[in-house]
């Protein structure tokens, strides 16, 4: 399967003990459980060996439990490259990207779901804006 091929390629990469691993949508051929398993493995590798892992991924929800730094591109142009929180703040300042920020934070905060905790979801823009203000964002609209 595609997932097995992805794991085999990762194993071959790890055999040479690289300091940096760059992956382009490594879970595109995997189901959600396989994707989360692979990202759990990559995170464990990072924690154990200090390997820097750079991932290009359009399904950001797969990565949110592990993200420390984030690069955001818009129409091929760099918007920001910073910590997760700083990148989210920069996105919030961009009128076109602002609607993505509540979902981004909700996903990041949703890490607890891995441990059996279900977080409430924002039902209105006002709820999202209130949460963003608690997190230190300025402005009244999400």
Predicted regions and their residues:
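A short, surface-exposed alpha-helical micro-motif characterized by mixed small hydrophobic
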Residues: 63-65
């Amino acid at each position: 399967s595609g997932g097995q091929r992805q794991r085999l390629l990762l194993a071959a990469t790890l055999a040479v003990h690289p300091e940096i691993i760059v992956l382009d949508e490594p879970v595109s051929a995997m189901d959600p459980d396989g994707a989360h398993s692979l990202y759990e493995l990559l995170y464990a590798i990072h924690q154990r060996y200090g390997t820097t892992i750079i991932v290009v991924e359009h399904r950001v929800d797969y990565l949110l439990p592990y993200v420390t730094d984030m690069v955001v591109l818009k129409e091929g142009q760099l918007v920001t490259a910073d910590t997760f929180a700083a990148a989210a703040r920069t996105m919030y300042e961009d009128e076109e990207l602002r609607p993505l920020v509540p979902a981004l934070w909700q996903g990041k905060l949703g890490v607890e779901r891995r441990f059996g905790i279900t977080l409430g979801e924002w039902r209105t823009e006002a709820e999202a804006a209130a949460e963003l203000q608690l997190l230190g964002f300025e402005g009244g609209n999400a």
